[in-house]
Amino acid sequence: MDNGLSRRHEISELLQLVDSTTTRAFHTSNGSPKSDCRNDSKPLKRYEELFGSFPAEGLGTSGFKDAIDLISRNSVDNASPGFLGKLVSAPSAPGIASDLFLSILNNNGHVQRAGPALTAIEKHTSLELARLFDLQGPHAGGVTVPGGAAGNLMAMLVARNIVAPESKQRGLTPGEYAIFVSDAAHYSVSNSANVIGLGNDSIIRVPALDDGTMDADALQRAVDQAGKDGKKPLLIAATSGSTVNGAFDPLDKIGEIAHRVGAWFHVDACWGGGVVFSDKLKHLMKGSHLADSIAFNPHKLLGVPLVCAFLLVNDLRTLWLANKLNAGYLFHDDAPKKNGVSSEQSANTNGSEKESWRHSKLLDTAPDVMKINDLASLTIQCSRRHDATKMFLHWLYYGTAGIAREVEQAVDSAKHLACLVRDHPRFELIWDPEQVFAQVCFYWKSASTPEKSGETLAEINSRNTRALFQGIEEMGWKVDFAPGKAKGEFLRIACNRLTTRQTVEKIVSELVELGESLGL
């Protein structure tokens, strides 16, 4: 057998093993509203046998089969209807196929000549997403990034290098700039400030209202106070679909403040961004047109396989100016010069331009963004997977309306769950159904009281929450819990595009039965 035929046979054989092994291990076809997500009972010794050392001679097909069998039986089945704990779901069928397709092609996404067709797909898909998010700039577009945290990080780096262009050459002076984030924002936003050299003292946390959204009035006060303290606003970060309760910040109000004070306006829409596909839900992101950058993860609510994430921007020239470095051995796109000075050098200069950076002449030194094809020059990466292809094929397969229906199903199931929880005497719903996106947060109403037990209410709630969490997971469900500000830890159930009303009715019934059996 020649090498080509041998390789094809080898790939086919291994893929058949993957298919049969995962089908046996996961319980996605039994028709039950929940499926067992539990791991193997005693896997540790077998893990050690498998991962302790590599063999001198390869184990071939049999070793591969044994390994994936063990791994799959000790992995979480997120295709199970009972998987309601994390902000991700079963990967879509076209997504799985496209993931395999990308692995077979194995094209790098750093320069066009390494993957010409897939580069064109990334540019096209990013532009279509930017339009869907109502980014209206003539140079709007985006690039893929290796996750939502990476998107938030790159947005902050771009903000630093564009709002304060001298920082790309000299760094930032401690205490000169401030960033503003909600106290309900994802931790990666604050972490990004540390990575780019701002430090914790530069992070100003804005209080959230009772519904979990950023208080725009408090933001204005915080910006005013920072100015009095001698700090310039570098970036204001809003959230569309917060991690805990799915809150959507008022983008129109926050964006207006950001534009007025000259701050970069970033929106973390990693979880909630899928609403832009739905005419019924896209109002939740009213004001997105004001954003300078938006982080969006199709691998969350849309069900595109991990990792598929984008950083969308209103002006692609900002990505080029912020991230471009001289690497002529790799990037062959023409970099125009003005008066003999490269655009990179020009972007490193200081001047009065930074006060009106959205209309800065520095942006005009960037090349025509439609002609930028070496996409790594727009990012902080070099080697890049063509993850946009997964979104492209997923979108092509389902269409905008099909994606919208799945997003709407997740929200409908969550609101139905919220109503069930609200109406049951043993539960206390934290956020009302009309405030719910795709997560539902609630307490168990305990028979115990602080007077009876000597515990605080927060201690009682946290103890009950953990007991229910452990018990329901032992019954095959995957849920989660989170800390409350005053009343202790609460249960959190995250619905996804596959969650049905039948499933949430079932888990409510089993939680009630469990809580009463435990005497909580």
From Swiss-Prot:
> Which pathway or pathways does this protein act in?
Mycotoxin biosynthesis
Reading the lineage from the top rank, the first entry is Eukaryota
Q: Which residues carry this modification: N6-(pyridoxal phosphate)lysine?
A: 300
EC number(s): the record gives 4.1.1.-
Question: Keywords in UniProt for this one?
Answer: Decarboxylase, Lyase, Pyridoxal phosphate
Q: Name one GO cellular component term.
A: cytoplasm
- Biological process terms in GO annotation: carboxylic acid metabolic process
What upregulates this protein? Answer: Highly expressed under trichothecene-producing conditions.
Obligatory cofactor(s): pyridoxal 5'-phosphate
Q: Where is this region: Disordered?
A: 338-357
User: Briefly, what is this protein's role?
Assistant: Glutamate decarboxylase-like protein; part of the gene cluster that mediates the biosynthesis of butenolide, a mycotoxin that shows antibiotic activity but does not seem to play a major role in the spread of head blight in wheat. Butenolide is derived from glutamic acid via a 4-acetamido-2-butenoic acid intermediate.
Name the UniProt record assigns to this protein? Glutamate decarboxylase-like protein FG08083
Name its species. Answer: Gibberella zeae (strain ATCC MYA-4620 / CBS 123657 / FGSC 9075 / NRRL 31084 / PH-1)
User: Lineage, please?
Assistant: Eukaryota, Fungi, Dikarya, Ascomycota, Pezizomycotina
